Swiss-Prot record:
One of the shell proteins of the carboxysome, a polyhedral inclusion where RuBisCO (ribulose bisphosphate carboxylase, rbcL-rbcS) is sequestered. Assembles into hexamers which make sheets that form the facets of the polyhedral carboxysome. The hexamer central pore probably regulates metabolite flux. Homohexamer. Interacts with CcmN and CcmO in the carboxysome. Keywords: Bacterial microcompartment, Carbon dioxide fixation, Carboxysome, Photosynthesis. Gene3D superfamilies: 3.30.70.1710. GO terms for cellular component: carboxysome. InterPro entries: Bact_microcomp_CS, BMC_dom, BMC_shell, CcmK, CcmK-like_sf, CcmK/CsoS1_BMC. The tight homohexamer forms a small pore which is positively charged. It comes from the Bacteria. Coiled coil: none annotated. One of its GO terms (molecular function) is structural constituent of carboxysome shell. It is found in: Carboxysome. Belongs to the bacterial microcompartments protein family. CcmK subfamily. This is Carboxysome shell protein CcmK.
Length: 112
């Protein structure tokens, strides 16, 4: 299973909160962080299986319009990010989000 990175950049903090909420509710992904870029630009970052991240980014994008003045500025998915990115950019699973990662990715069922 490939662990993808999905990003949604919005104009305004309320819009990114709406996007993040929709993203984690719509698919089995883990919210790993957000970045305030300046001028009201905020990016939310999720990790998970490629298909789940795709569904998550789509849901986040669709829900931003629910916020008065909310605007999607950009979205992007990286299917298999190079491991070096995890040590330089804020896309790594941290101890603080590990509990949520485990609830999103439960142990597979064993066949009897």
């Amino acid at each position: 299973m490939s662990i993808a990175v999905g990003m949604v950049e919005t104009l305004g903090f309320p819009a990114v909160v709406e996007a993040a909420d929709a993203m984690v509710k719509a698919a089995r992904v883990t919210l790993v962080g957000y970045e305030k870029i300046g001028s009201g630009r905020v990016t939310v970052i999720v990790r998970g299986d490629v298909s789940e991240v795709q569904a998550s980014v789509s849901a986040g994008t669709d829900n931003v319009s629910r916020v008065n003045g909310g605007q999607v500025l950009s979205t992007h998915i990286i299917a298999r990010p190079h491991e070096n990115l995890e040590y330089v950019l804020p896309i790594r699973y941290t101890e603080a989000v590990e509990q949520f990662r485990e609830s999103v990715n439960p142990q597979p069922l064993r066949r009897v």
